[in-house]
Amino acid sequence: MKLLIAKVSHETNTFSPVRTPLEAFGLNGPDYGADALAVQRGAPTAMGAFIDLAEAMGAEMVTPISAMANPSGTVDGAAYAHICQTIVDAAPGCDALLLD
């Protein structure tokens, strides 16, 4: 079984006029691939639990992105499109998607 495991988290404050850019989704922007796996493995998050479960099952994993921003204004359209496309691009051949 091949699982796509990803994290996208943002609390939107619609009253804020300032858009949330891609760079806000992590210390230096989102984590990708092996970095996303390393950051989330063992973390007290749903993505961390999904990774633990996948490893216990012996499942193959794809971790295209881990993106978490602090509460802020509406997500910039280009940032949203990039995050979504990163997940979509990793999906072919996967049996299931676990999204945190």
Annotated model-derived regions:
Residues 57-58, 95:
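Glycine-centered loop/turn motif at secondary-structure junctions
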Residues 27, 59-60, 91:
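Aromatic-enriched hydrophobic runs in primary sequence
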Residues 4, 9-11, 71-100:
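Active-site histidine-anchored catalytic micro-motif
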